[in-house]
């Protein structure tokens, strides 16, 4: 490799092959993990089937296949965020002018070899094929070519169109994200219906709010009047310049969303064909089929048609091409781990950053300086950090992998934070106004119907990122959080509040006494109920309502006498589901400090809503004052914990379950674990002695809830068909198993403990063996108390 490449290691020459009889050589011979600093990359990768137009130049091709030579174009979708999918929003890269009612099977028209060509399995490439590919690329960029893509695709059956789309996937990350978004959206009909109704909701909020605030003369309202008497004619013409600007901006945003929705319908239709024709999943079954079954069918499709126009991650990043013999002999499989890594390539970095406490999300000037994450701040993090780290193809930029660009990257990241701080400050009034209007229409009916929902709780955005595990897809994470809600609510309610209960009993007694007297007086003389005023303009009915409300609130604060208080048991049940157990919680489940700390993670919905509104004002300060100071640590972390996986590209090293690179205390020997623990205590003492204010960062590679061990166990539970032994991480685990000292890990209640007096020799690495035993004993169900 060129020494000037950002991937090259300037301090080492070309590596010499290690003896094949060593354990280290056997491990890395099986592993696909290559760190960016390594100067030699595995050349076995998928080749790119550049254009399906090659097929017309292949020997012996039949006339029926020759018609497919006119198919131009490729699937070139950009990288798509899973929570903002491009299905139904982005413009389609192909048109659907064909008749989907054509039920003729492509196997009736094409031979097996020709079907392999359609799916990208081109055999024996020659110079003529290369020439044809170049010629087809030129035709693809020429809009005046009569053999356009739309006319060519229009003559195919539904299954042939699906095969053509699969054969021309250029960006596998974006394609898999659309496949996942289609699954989460519950099929084409549900996605189209949901997005169309969302558009109508936005239109209703804009129109109804404009009518209420600008088209009604509230001073003319009378008890005996009519609606027509208070409506202002031509009210829009009388708007102030600011009100007109707000309406124009809202209408422009609505129009943009409507155009994107219409243009994305063709892609939604194409994804419907892909599910139905190639994966064999009709729209009615998308709502009930488990995700791991969808992944199995994707893997089977990849095994059947291993070579598409998809370029491997190596080719995309390095511009390299491998020989056709290597391509045919080393097809790259697509397993559940690869699918999850591609879908969550960006989110895995955020999970790692929150797990390592690198981001300073505190509002400057506040005394507590506790981290506060809202949806608006989360969106800004995606734009500033992930938008800077990844290019337009969804791949890590090369500059982040070399230390020589460190200063430029730090300065660039700081500028992005400062720029977005200014943008957020400018648009803050519009965002607050829209949030207030939308939330009022959205939640008023819910709380009016059931006022008790005002006291309901949910996890904060910060808690969700702390709980989430590597390669855990959003729908699986939501399911895990929902299973903990009952226990979490019981823990918050059952925690003894004797002081509050004593005061509540007194308030309930006083309010109940007043209510009883007023009700008794109303029964004895019904006229008193309405006509007798206790205070000016306030009759008996009014005060019965006031004291009744106070009585209801006070009774709600008094615990049931028959309830058995078990806060420790409830918190343990929560930990079994959330897999979150900080070090300072252990042995203190009964304490008020732990109850308060958990209450900050599982807080009232009304508080979260107020925090979202307030964050519109505080986000510019966080972006301007707090986050720029984190830029050096962020750049260093991204460079250090980015690895290269053949066929997958650059990903977060935590997401590949590379225990050899991130040795936590639970994967190391007892002595090593104690060394890490001592290092933690020393750093904490130094921070206390220096009186350091602001954020406190947990030591890297320390005992931070054994995040990777939890992730691999949870991933195995959610994907029962995934074989860890066939994955590269198994080699890393095996190396730790041979080299590490004796250690044990207890998964009950998520409490990991390392011991130094465990047996050695044959019993060395007992933790890793225990981890593997847990994986292979798993039944495939959701992770529960038996594993955690």
From Swiss-Prot:
Keywords: Autophagy, Cytoplasmic vesicle, Endoplasmic reticulum, Golgi apparatus, Lipid transport, Membrane, Transmembrane, Transmembrane helix, Transport
Domain notes: Forms a homotrimer with a solvated central pore, which is connected laterally to the cytosol through the cavity within each protomer. Acts as a lipid scramblase that uses its central pore to function: the central pore opens laterally to accommodate lipid headgroups, thereby enabling lipid flipping and redistribution of lipids added to the outer leaflet of ATG9-containing vesicles, thereby enabling growth into autophagosomes.
Native organism: Mycosarcoma maydis (Corn smut fungus)
Residue segments, region Disordered: 1-22, 87-108, 124-153, 307-332, 668-706, 742-762
Catalytic reaction annotation: a 1,2-diacyl-sn-glycero-3-phosphocholine(in) = a 1,2-diacyl-sn-glycero-3-phosphocholine(out); a 1,2-diacyl-sn-glycero-3-phospho-L-serine(in) = a 1,2-diacyl-sn-glycero-3-phospho-L-serine(out); a 1,2-diacyl-sn-glycero-3-phosphoethanolamine(in) = a 1,2-diacyl-sn-glycero-3-phosphoethanolamine(out); a 1,2-diacyl-sn-glycero-3-phospho-(1D-myo-inositol-3-phosphate)(in) = a 1,2-diacyl-sn-glycero-3-phospho-(1D-myo-inositol-3-phosphate)(out)
Xref: InterPro entries: Autophagy-rel_prot_9
Biased composition, class Basic and acidic residues, residue ranges: 1-14
Biased composition (Low complexity): 679-689
GO biological process: lipid transport; mitophagy; piecemeal microautophagy of the nucleus; protein localization to phagophore assembly site; reticulophagy
Pfam families the record matches: ATG9
Membrane-protein topology: Multi-pass membrane protein
Keyword field contains Membrane: yes
UniProt feature, compositional bias: Polar residues: 125-134
Full protein name: Autophagy-related protein 9
Function noted in UniProt: Phospholipid scramblase involved in autophagy and cytoplasm to vacuole transport (Cvt) vesicle formation. Cycles between the preautophagosomal structure/phagophore assembly site (PAS) and the cytoplasmic vesicle pool and supplies membrane for the growing autophagosome. Lipid scramblase activity plays a key role in preautophagosomal structure/phagophore assembly by distributing the phospholipids that arrive through ATG2 from the cytoplasmic to the luminal leaflet of the bilayer, thereby driving autophagosomal membrane expansion. Required for mitophagy.
């Amino acid at each position: 490799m060129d020494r000037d490449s950002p991937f090259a290691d300037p301090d080492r020459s070309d590596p010499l092959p290690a003896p094949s009889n060593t354990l280290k050589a056997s491990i890395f011979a099986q592993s696909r993990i290559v760190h960016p600093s390594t100067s030699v990359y595995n050349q076995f990768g998928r080749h790119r089937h550049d254009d399906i137009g090659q097929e017309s130049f292949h020997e012996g091709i039949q006339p029926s296949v020759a018609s497919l030579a006119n198919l131009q174009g490729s699937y070139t979708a950009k990288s798509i965020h899973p929570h903002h999918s491009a299905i139904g929003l982005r413009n389609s890269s192909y048109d659907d002018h064909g008749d989907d009612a054509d039920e003729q099977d492509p196997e009736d028209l094409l031979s097996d070899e020709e079907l392999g060509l359609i799916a990208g399995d081109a055999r024996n490439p020659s110079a003529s094929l290369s020439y044809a590919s170049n010629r087809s690329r030129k035709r693809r960029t020429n809009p005046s070519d009569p053999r356009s893509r739309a006319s060519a695709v229009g003559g195919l059956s539904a299954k042939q169109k699906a095969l053509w789309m699969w054969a021309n996937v250029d960006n596998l990350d974006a394609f898999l994200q659309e496949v996942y978004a289609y699954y989460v959206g519950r099929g084409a009909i549900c996605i189209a219906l949901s997005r169309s109704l969302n558009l109508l909701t936005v239109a209703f909020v804009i129109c109804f709010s404009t009518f209420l605030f600008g088209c009604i003369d509230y001073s003319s309202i009378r008890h005996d009047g009519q609606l027509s008497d208070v409506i202002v004619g031509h009210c829009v013409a009388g708007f102030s310049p600011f009100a007109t600007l707000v309406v124009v901006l809202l209408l422009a945003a609505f129009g943009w969303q409507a155009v994107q929705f219409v243009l994305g319908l063709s892609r939604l239709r194409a994804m419907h064909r892909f599910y139905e024709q190639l994966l064999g999943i009709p729209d009615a079954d998308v709502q009930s089929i488990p995700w791991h079954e969808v992944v199995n069918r994707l893997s089977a499709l990849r095994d059947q048609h291993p070579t598409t126009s998809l370029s491997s991650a190596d080719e995309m990043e390095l511009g390299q091409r491998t020989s056709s013999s290597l391509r045919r002999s080393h097809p790259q499989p697509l397993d559940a781990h690869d699918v999850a890594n591609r879908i969550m390539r960006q989110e895995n970095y955020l999970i790692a950053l929150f797990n390592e406490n690198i981001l300073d999300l505190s509002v400057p000037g506040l005394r507590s300086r506790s981290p506060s994450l809202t949806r608006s701040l989360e969106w800004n993090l995606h734009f500033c950090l992930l938008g800077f780290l990844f290019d337009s193809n969804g791949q890590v930029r090369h500059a982040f992998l070399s230390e020589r660009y460190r200063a430029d990257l730090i300065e660039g990241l700081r500028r992005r934070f400062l720029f977005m701080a200014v943008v957020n400050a400018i648009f803050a009034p519009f965002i607050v106004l829209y949030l207030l209007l939308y939330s009022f229409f959205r939640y008023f009916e819910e709380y009016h119907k059931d006022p008790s929902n005002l006291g309901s709780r949910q996890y904060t955005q910060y808690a969700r990122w702390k709980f989430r595990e590597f390669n855990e897809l959003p729908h699986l994470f939501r399911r895990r959080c929902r299973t903990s809600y009952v226990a979490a609510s019981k823990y918050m309610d059952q925690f003894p509040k004797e002081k509050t209960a004593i005061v509540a009993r007194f308030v309930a007694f006083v309010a109940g006494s007043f209510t009883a007297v007023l009700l008794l007086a109303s029964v004895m003389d019904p006229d008193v109920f309405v006509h007798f005023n206790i205070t000016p303009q306030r009759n008996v009915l009014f005060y019965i309502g006031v004291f009744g409300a106070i009585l209801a609130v006070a009774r709600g604060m008094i615990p049931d006498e028959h309830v058995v208080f078990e806060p420790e048991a409830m918190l343990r049940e929560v930990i079994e589901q959330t897999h979150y157990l900080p070090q300072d919680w252990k042995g203190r489940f009964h304490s008020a400090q732990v109850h308060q700390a958990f209450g900050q993670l599982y807080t009232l919905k009304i508080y979260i809503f107020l925090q979202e509104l307030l964050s519109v004002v505080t986000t510019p300060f966080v972006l301007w004052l707090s986050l720029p100071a984190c830029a050096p640590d962020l750049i260093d972390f991204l460079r250090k914990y980015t690895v290269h996986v053949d066929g997958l590209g650059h990903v977060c090293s935590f997401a590949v379950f590379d225990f050899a690179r991130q040795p936590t205390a639970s994967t190391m020997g007892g002595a090593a674990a104690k060394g890490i623990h001592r290092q933690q205590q020393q750093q904490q003492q130094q921070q206390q002695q220096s009186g350091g204010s602001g954020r406190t960062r947990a030591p890297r590679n320390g005992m931070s809830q054994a995040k990777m061990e939890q992730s691999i166990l949870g991933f195995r539970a959610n994907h029962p068909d995934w074989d860890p032994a066939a994955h590269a991480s198994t080699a890393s685990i095996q190396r730790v198993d041979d080299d590490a000292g004796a250690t044990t890990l207890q998964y009950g209640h998520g409490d990991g403990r390392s011991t130094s007096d465990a047996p050695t020799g044959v019993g060395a690495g007992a933790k890793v063996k225990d981890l593997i035993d847990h994986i292979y004993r798993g039944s495939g169900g959701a992770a529960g108390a038996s594993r955690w």
